[in-house]
């Protein structure tokens, strides 16, 4: 998996299936400067469904929102290039209470705590792009913002006035 290390409007990830696809993606990102000047991160290819866990964070205090899943691919059947998000849904049947507890206790809360320890505390939204693999929940990405389009299906489920959160 090749990821452009910078802003790419949700389109900077290529899951290359062949070396030719990988070379083409690297050429596009680095030599042709598709997203500007930057670097590329090479990651292991993981299998399993992706999901998004957004949390309200104030320092080490982390409050989860409902999990959601977006549809990234341009074509039906999860085919084609990644987009910035074609739609989303929530109430994910494949996520167990244990998965959510792991994501909170081993990913989201430790991340917020580490940000405080590094002198960069977050007050806002921490977005965890996660994947449920055969080996458990893994981190795909983090953002310090609401997920798009996931926010469209998550915010209506929050009972309180969101203005009170901030």
Predicted regions and their residues:
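Short glycine-enriched loop/turn motifs at secondary-structure junctions
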Residues: 6-10
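Internal nucleotide-binding/catalytic subdomain
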Residues: 12-153
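Conserved, structured core segments of small domains
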Residues: 148, 156-160, 165
